Amino acid sequence: RVLRPNGKFIVTTPNVLMSLTRNPWHVREYHADELKNILECEFDEVEAMGVFGNKKVMTYYNKNKKSVARITRLDILDLQHRLPRWMLQWPYDILNRLNRRWLYDENKTLTSSIKMSDYSIGPVADNCFDLFYIATKK
């Protein structure tokens, strides 16, 4: 037993629906209902929320999405989904850093202006960046 009665387990994890490509550093990514179902097997109460971005964050996300699409279109053999995680980690790191640097250089004002206050927590939905769940053990 890890939690006392009425103890809370708080977890955040990426929302697979908003992931732009396979991240080899993530062992598993979840859909909202999938994670909720897993938690409900062990916890009496599960509060499902999501982390959302405002218009500025979504503008950055869409620019990043286009940039990632330019990179992944070169993966004609779909190796990102066929190779084991460990083989993708260093290429992912290199390409991710190059992509983030390019995005910053091309969008300095936007990138520099994004703050924590541009994010909010609300009821879970398909367009949340991260799943944020609070599970309570009775």
Describe the function of each predicted region:
Residues R1-T136:
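S-adenosyl-L-methionine-dependent methyltransferase catalytic module, highlighting the catalytic core
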